[in-house]
Each structure stands twice: as structure tokens, then as C-alpha cells.
Regions:
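Short, well-structured alpha-helical segments
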Residues: 45-54
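Alpha-helical transmembrane bundle of multi-pass membrane proteins
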Residues: 1-31, 37, 56-274
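Charge-rich, low-complexity intrinsically disordered segments
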Residues: 34-35, 45
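Short helix/loop segments within enzyme catalytic domains
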Residues: 39-41
Length: 274
């Protein structure tokens, strides 16, 4: 069963074209134009190829270049987004879902079944994010979803602190939280982190941001059971809700919208604000 998704991914990958940037870099401009024309006009495709050529002349960047004035802001945005993706509690809930459901009153086998439902909702709403990201925009989706996550976590903490709701209601609150996360913070953080960096330094920048993201994940995974045992599960959930509030403020004031902008346009915007 575990091999089925891998096989499907492999088969679908066979139909994915090479990126226009890679094709141009390797002297295959006609193929790059054909790929771009599938999603835009011939005129726009030609302009995009010219922009790609301009960026390719810059060469490869190093980690040291990430700390230049023009790149400090996108680097800070990527790092903060990476941290917020984790400290808003997603992997505490995913990793410890069976324990959370047992604490909520589900039998052990039933708790494992609820964890399966959580995974299914996570997958379905990731598809929603894919559909809406280029229609609605990154910022609106992230703002709405982060607010929804915060409200869900407040309700979840209250449900644990004041156990008057049936276990099924608690399950619905968790599924609501998962749906909000999967529709924005889950996939779109990776999208935004990739989009805001110039091509020259993207590899180094994404590597650094990813390292910090998983360090934050490690911290959350390590501290959730400690907080739950020493204080109360509601304390952890309310702490994650507070992180959602901080994330909302950060997105509102500092995150630019990247919808509809080419990578080259985004790069030029950083140069203007440096």
C-alpha cells in the first residue's frame, strides 16, 4: 500500500515538462517557449525568456550573498514564515494525534482511526490550496487560514480545559484546524519561500530556511508533551494560538503578494526596497 503513492507520483512526473529556466540555461529555447506558451501568450513567453536570460548571466550565488542589503528582507521573511509554519502547532497535532484523541476520550483503536481522517483532510485541503493560490493570491489565503487556525486552537484549548463537549465535537475542531493549515500555511509557505528569492541564491536560501523550519519542528515536537504533562494540553494549544496571532501580524505588515509576478519582477522589487 505504501508504494502506491510513489508509483502514482512517478507516472505523473513523466508528464511534467522541464522548467523553462533549465531549458534556456541548456540552450533549448524553443522547448522553453513551447512550455511557456501552454500557460501564456507567445509575446509573454518571449518576454519571459528574455528575462530568464538576463538572470542567468548573473551566475550562481553563495550563502554569504544572502546577507547583502537587497536580500536581507526576503531572507528574514522566509525564516520567519518557516518558523511560524511549525510553532503554530501543526506537527504537534499530527505527530501526537493518537494521544490527543485518547486524551479526548476516544478508545485507542478509534483514536488511530481518527488520525487517518486527519491525514485525509490534510490531503484534500492541500488540493484546495493548489486550486486557489493563483486565483485568490498568497497573502489573502495565508491571512484567512492563519486566522482560522488561531480560532480553532483557542476552541481546542477550551475543549480540553472545560471538557463539556462530546469527543466528536473535539474531532471536528481538530479537522477544522487541519483544513485551515492545509489550505495555506502547509503548502504556500514553501511556494512563497521559493518565489521571493532571486534565482542566483535560491538554492542556498531555501536550504537555510528549510534547516530552520525543521529545527523549529524539532522544538515543537520536543516541547509539546512536556507542556501538556507539566501544565495542561490546553496550555500548548493556546500557546500555538498566540503564535497564530503573531503570524497574522507578520503576514499583514511584511509579506508581499507574489501572485501574478514573475521571479524577475519579484527580484527587482527587492532591489528597489533595499
Amino acid at each position: 500500500m505504501g508504494a502506491i503513492p510513489s508509483v502514482l507520483f512517478f507516472l505523473l512526473l513523466l508528464r511534467v515538462p522541464e522548467s523553462p529556466r533549465w531549458l534556456v540555461k541548456n540552450g533549448r529555447e524553443d522547448e522553453a517557449g513551447a512550455v511557456l506558451i501552454r500557460v501564456d501568450t507567445a509575446e509573454a513567453a518571449a518576454k519571459e525568456i528574455r528575462d530568464i536570460k538576463d538572470t542567468l548571466t548573473l551566475g550562481e550565488g553563495s550563502i554569504r550573498e544572502l546577507f547583502r542589503p537587497a536580500l536581507r528582507r526576503p531572507l528574514l521573511i522566509a525564516i520567519v514564515l518557516a518558523v511560524f509554519q511549525q510553532v503554530t502547532g501543526i506537527n504537534a497535532i499530527l505527530y501526537y494525534a493518537p494521544r490527543i484523541f485518547e486524551d479526548a476520550g476516544f478508545a485507542r483503536m478509534s483514536a488511530i482511526g481518527q488520525s487517518t481522517i486527519v491525514g485525509l483532510v490534510n490531503m484534500l485541503f492541500t488540493v484546495v490550496a493548489i486550486v486557489l493560490a493563483d486565483r485568490v493570491g498568497r497573502r489573502p489565503l495565508l491571512l484567512i487560514a492563519t486566522g482560522g487556525m488561531g480560532v480553532s486552537l483557542v476552541l481546542l484549548g477550551a475543549a480540553f480545559r472545560f471538557p463539556v463537549l462530546p469527543a466528536s465535537a473535539l474531532l471536528l475542531i481538530i479537522l477544522l484546524y487541519i483544513a485551515f493549515f492545509a489550505s495555506a500555511m502547509g503548502p504556500l509557505v514553501w511556494v512563497v519561500m521559493a518565489e521571493i528569492f532571486p534565482i542566483k541564491v535560491r538554492g542556498s536560501a531555501m536550504g537555510l530556511a528549510t534547516l530552520i523550519l525543521w529545527l523549529a519542528d524539532f522544538a515543537v515536537t520536543l516541547t509539546f508533551p512536556v507542556i501538556s504533562d507539566k501544565f495542561h494540553p490546553s496550555t500548548a494549544f493556546w500557546l500555538y494560538a498566540a503564535m497564530c496571532a503573531c503570524d497574522l501580524v507578520f503576514i499583514w505588515f511584511f509579506l508581499p503578494e507574489t501572485k501574478g509576478k514573475s521571479l524577475e519582477e519579484i527580484e527587482r522589487s527587492w532591489l528597489k526596497t533595499a
